[in-house]
């Protein structure tokens, strides 16, 4: 089974991916973790690495390559804003493709708590990161991140919370 889970920062993709991975014994491959690792490898902050990635499509190509390679083995949760799109562009069809969404201020608050930083700073960083990613996705892939047409499920995570989102997905899997 291959499940893709996407969503903007703070929507709960990692939380849900971990819950599903544990419940169903699936590997969890996260594009965001790959990106963060690559930023650290290059001694850059996330924002610096995002700016670098805007000018160097090799960053995205490497993340994509790793995701596709992992998906070939099956039995995984593939988490990332473009996970569903990357599989589609590589003629791979997941068993279930999910997009999580949430109100921007809810997302900002979640990020602020996770990163232990001021809400205003978290909001500023979140908006900069999203603008950078949106630009990259359009330039590199010709993908509009707001186009949710490829997803089987679109879930409002701020309405349902982690348990509710998990239960909805579990029903879809069965």
UniProtKB/Swiss-Prot annotation:
Q: What are the UniProt keywords, alphabetically?
A: ATP-binding, Cytoplasm, Kinase, Nucleotide-binding, Transferase
Documented EC number(s): 2.7.4.25
Enzyme type, top EC level: transferase
The record lists ATP as bound by 7-15
Q: Which Pfam families match?
A: Cytidylate_kin2
Q: Which SUPFAM superfamilies match?
A: P-loop containing nucleoside triphosphate hydrolases
Per UniProt, what is one GO molecular function of this protein?
A: CMP kinase activity
Provide the protein's localization. Cytoplasm
Q: Which GO terms describe its biological process?
A: pyrimidine nucleotide metabolic process
The UniProt entry, under InterPro entries, shows: Cyt_kin_arch (IPR011892), Cytidylate_kinase_dom (IPR011994), P-loop_NTPase (IPR027417)
Protein's name according to its UniProt entry: Cytidylate kinase
- What is the originating organism of this protein? Methanococcus vannielii (strain ATCC 35089 / DSM 1224 / JCM 13029 / OCM 148 / SB)
